[in-house]
């Protein structure tokens, strides 16, 4: 291949990458991921994907929670960008389990922040947290397994997510560096004599 041919080929690849939305090209795996923003959760490695190469749309927030903005993003990718699978990843030792909601509310109020009638979106003034609603909005939680399972069911039943989309939830174990389904801890299955079938 001549240098000219190589450069033309490279250009075509760059053009295809830059214009993939205009050309109707979905992400490579037709995948949308919602994961916690925690740096200990290596989404690409955990799922065996290359986000930097276009394998998935990855949405990250505190806790990997299905919020209104997560629904907005999932709705767009599933209905308009060809996405056919959703994976939700929560993780052990998540900061969203590290404090009670009341503690968060008090800490912010102690900083002088008014949490009553808090506007969430300047373009949608209707999206305002009324007095006492901030705690529900911030979504601190107690149990990572319950939270993950509940989010999967919520997405499966959401009217903006097409019914054909495959949806699963997983827990990243920070302590082992592996994914597992909610409510299944391998360590509990192999580390007791009862689990091992002792008589």
Curated annotation (Swiss-Prot):
One Pfam match, given by its short name, reads: Pro_CA
Q: Which InterPro entries match?
A: Carbonic_anhydrase (IPR001765), Carbonic_anhydrase_sf (IPR036874)
Molecular function via GO:
carbonate dehydratase activity; hydrolase activity; zinc ion binding
List the SUPFAM superfamilies. Answer: beta-carbonic anhydrase, cab
- Please name the pathway: Sulfur metabolism; hydrogen sulfide biosynthesis
Going by the record, the broad EC class of this enzyme is hydrolase
Q: Which reaction does it catalyse?
A: carbon disulfide + 2 H2O = 2 hydrogen sulfide + CO2 + 2 H(+)
Keywords tagged on the record: Hydrolase, Metal-binding, Zinc
Q: What family does the entry list?
A: Belongs to the beta-class carbonic anhydrase family.
Protein's recorded name: Carbon disulfide hydrolase
């Amino acid at each position: 291949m001549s240098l000219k041919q190589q450069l033309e080929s490279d250009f075509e690849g760059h053009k295809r990458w830059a214009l993939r939305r205009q050309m109707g090209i979905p992400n490579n795996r037709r995948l949308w991921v919602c994961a916690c923003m925690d740096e200990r959760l290596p989404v690409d490695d955990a799922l065996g994907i290359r986000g930097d190469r276009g394998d998935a749309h990855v949405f990250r927030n505190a806790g990997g929670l299905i919020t209104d903005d997560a629904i907005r993003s999932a709705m767009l990718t599933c209905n308009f960008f060809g996405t056919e699978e959703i994976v939700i990843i929560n993780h052990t030792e998540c900061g969203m389990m590290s404090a009670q909601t009341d503690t968060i509310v008090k800490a912010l109020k102690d900083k002088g922040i008014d949490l009553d009638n808090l506007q969430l979106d300047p373009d949608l003034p209707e999206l305002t947290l009324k007095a006492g609603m901030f705690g529900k909005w911030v979504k601190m939680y107690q149990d990572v397994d319950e939270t993950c399972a509940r989010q999967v069911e919520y997405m499966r039943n959401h009217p903006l997510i097409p019914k054909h989309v495959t949806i699963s939830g997983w827990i990243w174990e920070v302590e082992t560096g592996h994914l597992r389904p909610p409510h299944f801890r391998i360590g509990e299955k192999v580390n007791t004599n009862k689990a091992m079938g002792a008589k």
